[in-house]
Every structure is written in C-alpha cells, then in structure tokens.
Curated annotation (Swiss-Prot):
Up-regulation conditions: Induced by L-ascorbate. Repressed by UlaR.
EC number of this enzyme: 3.1.1.-
Its biological purpose: Probably catalyzes the hydrolysis of L-ascorbate-6-P into 3-keto-L-gulonate-6-P. Is essential for L-ascorbate utilization under anaerobic conditions.
BP GO annotations: L-ascorbic acid catabolic process
Entry keywords, A to Z: Cytoplasm, Hydrolase
Record-stated family: Belongs to the UlaG family.
InterPro entries hit by this protein: L-ascorbate_6P_UlaG, RibonucZ/Hydroxyglut_hydro, UlaG-like_MBL-fold, UPF0173_UPF0282_UlaG_hydrolase
Full protein name: Probable L-ascorbate-6-phosphate lactonase UlaG
Cofactor(s) listed: a divalent metal cation
Source species of the chain: Shigella dysenteriae serotype 1 (strain Sd197)
Length: 354
C-alpha cells in the first residue's frame, strides 16, 4: 500500500500529538534542583509543575483538554457562568491557543496532584487517569471539596484524596502546602443549569476554590488560580513571606470581568509583598488574548513613584523559571541551542560561504 493511502486521521493525530511528546517530561525528570532554589515549569493556562531542592514534584491545575472545536451549536450552554455574568446567548469563541507541552501518560515521578477549583480548565480526568495508572499508589489528590468530589466521581479512591480549605496545611516531603482564601467570584456563579443565582446569597467560596502557597526550602510560590483582585491579598502578604506570585491575567471581553487586568496584577504584587509577579492564563483562550508586556509597561511607569519591591516576569508555556536565579530577569526565551558551534570543523565549500 502506498504511504498516502496508509495514513489516516487517527495515525496523523497519534504521530503528532502531544506536540512536545515527552520532551518536557524528560527535562523535568533530569532537572537537579540546586539547594536554596526551586524550579517550576508553565504547563499552560494555570498549570504549574513545581520541583523542590529535595526532588519533590507537585503539579497544580494541569489541564489536558481543549476549547471550542466546532461552530455546530451557535448557543452557549444554558446556565453557563458566563451567561449568568453577562446575560449572553451566543457561543463563547474560546479556542485553545497553546500546544500540549507535557504528556500526562509519560509522568512517572510525582508526589501530589492539586487543583485550585473545579472549572474544566483547572482539573483534568486524563491527568487523574495517567497518575492512577502509571505512578505510585500513594500519590495524593489535593483540592477543595468540589475538586475532590470530581476526582472521586472519576474513580480516584476516596482515601487518595485530601480536602483542603483555607487555613489547612499539607506537607508533601519537603514542600509545605498552605491552602488560603480564594477570590474567584466566577466560581460562585458556576451552578447547575436549573439553579438560579439571582437574588440568592451564594454559598461559601471555601468548598469551591482555594489559593495555594507552596513553601519550599528554597523559597515560596503563591498560586492564585482564577482569583480576581481582592484586598485580602494584602492580608496574605502580611501573614506569609511570598517570593513568586502567579496571577490570572487576561483581556476581559465587553460585559465580562473574569481575569485580572495589568493594573490588578501590579496591585496583587504590591499587596502580597512579592518579589516577582508572573501572569498566566492569558495564553490559553483566544477570546481573552492579552499582551503581558502591558504589565511591564505599567510597572515601568509606576515603579519609582510607588517604590515597588517586585518585578514582573513574562513567561512562555513550557518554559522553566528558577527562583532565585531568574528573579532579575524580565522575560523568558526558549533555549536557542547551538551553544556548541565550531566544536567540530564545519563542512562548507569555502570559509566565507556563510
């Protein structure tokens, strides 16, 4: 059979997906985190892989699904949180814009799986399945009640799950995980389709979402999930030493308030007394596309007048950030390679060929 006749849609998908293969899995496994540091990788959306100097591996909000893929149904799902928020009827054109950089089924070394809240782009059944099938049988699944309910519903044993609420602390080897208050108002209107929100006091946030502070021997990382801006960031900054803070940034469409703005990101960094502030989530949805350079421009305008004690860092999906080695950098660039140029003799027709 000719090659073109043997190729199918399925063979094409299997040969190209996930786009990065196991490249990042291997990089994370091979990384030796130096004492006094921690390393983390951006997995897309708010997904983070954190590795401590003791070799402890935890992932947060690792999501392996996609957004809209068809114009088939022009209407938004009845009762969707965005419909409640803005009174819209049309389908939200949120297409996934970044590739899959980590293969969940190539994960072998992991010490905990965490989720910030139960929205589809923060918790993933494929990740749960891969960890259950391929990793140690004592890896815990940590999250608020709504996330644990999802995991158990998918088949994760109850005894493998840990429900956390603000104030709880979970120790995973040399990483101390603090569950803190979340400020994700969108989560409060994520309700069953037949349930009305109008005129009804929302139930508490604590069962739905938490923020996380990861305290490692080499520094601390604040993960805010999908939280909006809140004055309570200042309380968290008063109570904890925060080195690096991650915040959900995006260009909110007309009639929508779901992501922090560039000004919100700076206010968050100041309130938390962070050393570095990194935007995330702006990478993933086409209709929330935003330029993170706006944060840096605004920071440059304000930093001297307001005496900011933090710097912004513009990351790329799949990239690594090491605290404190990268604390004075402003932007990430993927490794460019060719550092070994001219270690062997070039094979060119003549020296001035290039």
């Amino acid at each position: 059979m000719s090659k073109v006749k043997s190729i199918t849609r399925e063979s094409w998908i299997l040969s190209t997906f996930p786009e990065w293969g196991s490249w990042l899995n291997e990089e994370i496994e091979q990384e030796q985190v130096a004492p006094g540091t921690f390393a983390m990788w951006w997995l897309g959306c708010t997904g983070i892989w954190l590795k401590s100097e003791g070799g402890t591996n935890v992932c947060v909000d690792f999501w392996c699904d996609t957004g809209k893929q068809s114009h088939g149904n022009p209407l938004m799902k009845q009762g969707h949180q965005m419909q409640r928020m803005a009174g819209v009827k049309k389908l939200q054109p949120n297409l996934r814009t970044n590739p899959f950089v980590l293969d969940p089924f190539a994960i072998r070394q992991i010490d905990a799986v965490l989720a910030n809240h139960d929205h589809n782009d923060h918790i993933d059944v494929n990740v749960a399945a891969a960890v259950m099938q391929n990793c140690a049988d004592d890896v815990p699944f940590i999250g608020p009640k709504t996330c644990v309910d999802l995991w158990i519903g998918w088949g994760v044993p109850k005894e493998r799950c840990i429900v956390v609420k603000p104030g709880d602390v979970v120790k995973v080897k040399d990483i101390e995980i603090h569950a803190l208050d979340a400020f994700d108002r969108t989560a409060l209107i994520t309700l069953p389709a037949d349930q009305k929100a109008a005129g009804i006091l929302p139930d508490g946030m604590d069962d739905r979402a938490v923020n996380y502070l990861f305290k490692t021997p080499g520094g601390s990382l604040y993960h805010s999930g999908d939280s909006h801006y809140s004055n309570y960031y200042a309380k968290h900054g008063n109570e904890h030493q925060i080195d690096v803070a991650l915040g959900s940034y995006g260009e909110n469409p007309r009639g929508i308030t779901d992501k922090m703005t560039s000004a919100d990101m700076l206010r968050m960094g100041e309130a938390l007394n962070a050393k570095v502030v990194i935007p995330f989530h702006h990478d993933i949805w086409s209709n929330f596309q935003a330029d993170p350079q706006e944060i840096r421009v605004l920071w440059e305008m304000k930093k001297d007048r307001l005496k900011y004690g933090f710097k912004p860092f513009i990351w790329q999906v799949g990239g690594k950030f090491t605290w404190p080695l990268d604390k004075d950098n402003f932007e990430y660039h993927y490794p460019r390679g060719f550092d070994d140029c001219f270690t062997i003799e070039p094979d060119l027709p003549f020296k001035s060929f290039l």
